[in-house]
């Protein structure tokens, strides 16, 4: 399972290849080999997308995954290169816990989560995976958690207060 940077295609997006798996379908005449690729694409400023591609050849699978990731991009509200608040994400048997970290802490996360944070533009975060560490589940759980992030303006609107009241600066 190789981890690569495939930088830029001219559109300013960072592409990360998280993993390539060889899969086999057993049929009457023998085995049919194919490949599946998992990728994330980010703009370095809160935009992130995930894609999975399958093909009989690795480059085609990777290209399909990159294209799907570009089509599935979402915007996550960040604050000074870290998260707005601590958040938990779940997918399948995977639970991820992510919390903001002070400036200079760096990305304290392993495996597939580190690739997601690099692509999205988070520079200071502490994260932990509980349960299954399958890369696909970890990426999905991370994105599910990131999509739960609320900005102070969102919370103020829900409560009918001002942002200053929410932040405690009165």
From Swiss-Prot:
Q: Which GO terms describe its biological process?
A: translation
A single GO cellular-component term on record: small ribosomal subunit
PROSITE patterns given in the database record: RIBOSOMAL_S5, S5_DSRBD
Sorted alphabetically, which Gene3D superfamilies does this protein's record hold? 3.30.160.20, 3.30.230.10
Keyword check for Zinc, yes or no.
no
- Short name of any one Pfam family annotated for the protein: Ribosomal_S5
Sorted alphabetically, the keyword list is:
Ribonucleoprotein, Ribosomal protein, RNA-binding, rRNA-binding
Q: Which GO terms describe its molecular function?
A: rRNA binding; structural constituent of ribosome
* InterPro entries referenced in this protein's UniProt entry, alphabetically: Ribosomal_Su5_D2-typ_SF, Ribosomal_uS5, Ribosomal_uS5_bac-type, Ribosomal_uS5_C, Ribosomal_uS5_N, Ribosomal_uS5_N_CS, Ribsml_uS5_D2-typ_fold_subgr
Q: Where is the S5 DRBM domain?
A: 13-76
Disulphide bond pairs: none
Quaternary structure annotation from Swiss-Prot or TrEMBL? Part of the 30S ribosomal subunit. Contacts proteins S4 and S8.
Summary of the function given for this chain in its UniProt record: With S4 and S12 plays an important role in translational accuracy.
| Similarity comment: family membership | Belongs to the universal ribosomal protein uS5 family.
Domain writeup:
The N-terminal domain interacts with the head of the 30S subunit; the C-terminal domain interacts with the body and contacts protein S4. The interaction surface between S4 and S5 is involved in control of translational fidelity.
Q: What is this protein called?
A: Small ribosomal subunit protein uS5
Q: What organism does this protein naturally occur in?
A: Laribacter hongkongensis (strain HLHK9)
Name of encoding gene: rpsE
